[in-house]
């Protein structure tokens, strides 16, 4: 699963996801993409599940790019531990995804296969998405 090799700080505030994505809103690598429509935190496990769904549907043909990376640690206290006595230890990693962000890109496959692969991937993700394509591809 995806996670940073090292970080400046072990723990981070939860924060909020405000506004629209500034960068990463257009297709840069592939011909087809899966774009986020709403703000959400996507975990490393969800990204991996979506990646597996896409690669299985494509039957190992074409090329996949993952355009998001989980770089925010989420801490959690153990079960049945009383409140207080500090913040819990980092449990998993998430990527903060803003609306308009292209999360996955595909190339080297027909449009119907790409659309089907992204439908399977969208079912694994906690946010609404839409299918996008380069002009002239559809």
Swiss-Prot record:
Signal peptide from the UniProt entry: none
GO biological process: translation
Highest taxon of source: Bacteria
Keyword check for rRNA-binding: yes
Known role: Binds 23S rRNA and is also seen to make contacts with the A and possibly P site tRNAs.
Cited NCBIfam families: rplP_bact (TIGR01164)
Keywords: Ribonucleoprotein, Ribosomal protein, RNA-binding, rRNA-binding, tRNA-binding
Protein name (record): Large ribosomal subunit protein uL16
PROSITE patterns per record: RIBOSOMAL_L16_1, RIBOSOMAL_L16_2
Pfam family, one: Ribosomal_L16
Name of the coding gene: rplP
Source organism per UniProt: Rhodospirillum rubrum (strain ATCC 11170 / ATH 1.1.1 / DSM 467 / LMG 4362 / NCIMB 8255 / S1)
């Amino acid at each position: 699963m995806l996670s940073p090799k090292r970080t400046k700080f072990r723990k981070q505030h939860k924060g909020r996801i405000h506004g629209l994505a500034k960068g990463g809103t257009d297709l840069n690598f592939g011909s087809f993409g899966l774009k986020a429509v709403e703000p959400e935190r996507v975990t490393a496990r969800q990204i991996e599940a979506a990646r597996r769904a896409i690669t299985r549907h494509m039957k190992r043909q074409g090329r996949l790019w993952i355009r998001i990376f989980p770089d925010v640690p989420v801490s959690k206290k153990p079960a049945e531990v009383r409140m207080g006595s500090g913040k819990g230890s980092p449990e998993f990693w998430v990527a903060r995804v803003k609306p308009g962000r292209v999360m996955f890109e595909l190339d080297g496959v027909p449009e119907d296969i790409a659309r089907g692969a992204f439908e399977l991937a969208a079912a694994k993700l906690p946010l609404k998405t839409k299918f996008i394509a380069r002009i002239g591809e559809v």
